[in-house]
C-alpha cells in the first residue's frame, strides 16, 4: 500500500504484505488495527479481556514478536496482554520518508492507541529500548492510568549527558550500513544464538530497504545534545516522573553495554522504585530472547493477585 495521510498530505506509506507474517514460529496472535490520521497501527490483544492490561512495548528495530516467550505465561496466569507494533515496525504502516518519523509524532501515535482508542487504565507496562523512550512519556502524561511500570534496558534521555560510546557506535552503524539486516542485529545483540527461522521472523516486516526508514531513523531521534527537539519535552516528562510513586521496577541485563547504568539512574530519580525487587538478568540487549520466561515470571510476581 502506498497512501497519503490526513496528518501530512505528503506522507507516503508502505504496508508489509500479510503473507510475510504467515507461519511464524510461536506467534499465533491475530492483529487488531487502529487508524490514526491515515496511519494504520497494529496491536495484539489477547488473554483475559476482563483483566487489567499488561502493556508490552518493543523498541528498535524489533516488533511485538520480541515478546513471544513472555506472552504465554501471562495468559496462563489470567492476564490480558496487549502488545503494540510501533509505526515503522511489525504490521504497522511504514512511512517511507525518514523525515516523517519524529520523537513527538511517535509519542502521539502511541498515545492514540493506548489512551484514545483502547482507553486503558490500571496498566502494567513493560517497556524495552524505544518502548521506554515512548512509554515513559505516556506515564509522565497520564500517571493515573499506569498502576505499575517495569523498565528494561531503556532510559529517557534529555541530551544533557553523553549516551556513551557504545550507543554512538550503534548510531553510526545504523546510518552507514549498506544493508541493515534486522534479524542479524537482534541475533548479535542477544546472548542466545537465534535459529534461522527466528531471525527470519524479525526480518519479516521489512521486505526491502524501502521499509526500513523507521529502523534507520530511530537511532538519530535519541536526544544526545540539549538543543535536540526532544530534549525539552523529555525534561518536562522527568518533572512528572519524579513524582511517580507507584511501583516502578528495573529489569536490566548484565551484557548490554548500550544501556548499562541507566537502571541506577531510573531508580535514583523515580520514587516508586524504592524498596522494589530490582533485577539484573543474564542477557544481551534483547533480554526477551535470553530470559523470556524469567521476564514473564517477574511480571506475574509484580502484579498483585486479584
Indicate residue ranges for each PLM-predicted region:
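Catalytic histidine-centered segment of alpha/beta-hydrolase-like enzymes
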Residues: 283-296
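Structural cue for short, hydrophobic secondary-structure segments
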Residues: 56-59, 83
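A short acidic, amphipathic alpha-helical/loop segment
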Residues: 69-70, 265, 294
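Flexible "cap/lid" subdomain of the alpha/beta-hydrolase fold that forms the substrate-access gate
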Residues: 11-30, 41, 46-47, 53, ...
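Short, Lys/Arg-enriched N-terminal segments with co-localized hydrophobic residues
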Residues: 1-10
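Active-site glycine-rich loops that stabilize anionic/oxyanionic intermediates
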Residues: 59-62, 129
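Short amphipathic alpha-helix adjacent to the substrate-entry channel of hydrolases
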Residues: 65-82
